[in-house]
Amino acid sequence: MSHAINYTQHKELSVEMNDFILSLPCSSPLCRRLDSPGCSRKSSNCQYQVSYGDGSFTFGDFSLETLTFRRAQVPRVALGCGHDNEGLFVGAAGLLGLGRGGLSFPTQAGTRFDNKFSYCLTDRTASTKPSSIVFGDSAVSRTARFTPIIINPKLDTFYYLELLGISVGGAPVRGISASLFRLDSTGNGGVIIDSGTSVTRLTRPAYVALRDAFRVGASHLKRAPEFSLFDTCYDLSGLPEVKVPTVVLHFRGADVSLPAANYLIPVDNSGRFCFAFAGTMSGLSIIGNIQQQGFRVVFDLAGSRVGFAPRGCA
């Protein structure tokens, strides 16, 4: 099986904030829920600091605010008012935490939105349409296929899913089994879905098996030099259409068939495309946002499940 693809973002979230922000005192119970709470000597206000894997960080006052999404207001949301934001934020006005942590937006405001939300990420390189996020019952797509959320008591901020296997070209990849993605009793291993990670990372044995299967299916394509973390690249310059093997992620209860643009991506202007997966020496695998593009990804926290609806950005 193969995809025929023609190679012929902006991501925004409109949130209004009140002019009045209530800074939290250092003695606030909310302040003590921060991983690394700080306290201003001048004002005795609670301060936060968060660092990210790419080296970016934000520092400022921990405050209460009313957020407005179009006509819906959500009062008394605890958030950080950043005074020092550095790194790869690329002009973003802020970050909305959507994880399972105690201070994430879904946790704080979940009951108002029936503990349901979904997003659809558009292709940054090919679409002028903005990405979207929906809260409430309307977030649940009728065409979504669902897989259960697995709880990791040792690390409860992430959404863990059960990945059973991967198919390439219509055949299960030999060497990939559910055991490579299993969450063990110590909280290690497993698979999470994360909108903040670009490229899907698989445990090294799973990645090597997937990569090798794809290389066999794409052996008719001209290879190109490696690029950054991508070790499987092709020279597609001058080709208006290319056939590549299909890639399907098999979650428990949900098979997710990826569009070709979600795993063979352009990395320069000379026609070089790379297989957009990578390996990791860690036991934790991550489903990144490139592989999520174009799907409406539904988080039904009330039902403890995550769903995938193809062509969900319409």
Stretch-by-stretch model annotation:
Residues 1-30, 67, 95-99, 181-221, ...:
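Aspartyl protease active-site motif detector
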Residues 1-77, 83:
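Signature of the N-terminal lobe/flap region of pepsin-like aspartyl proteases
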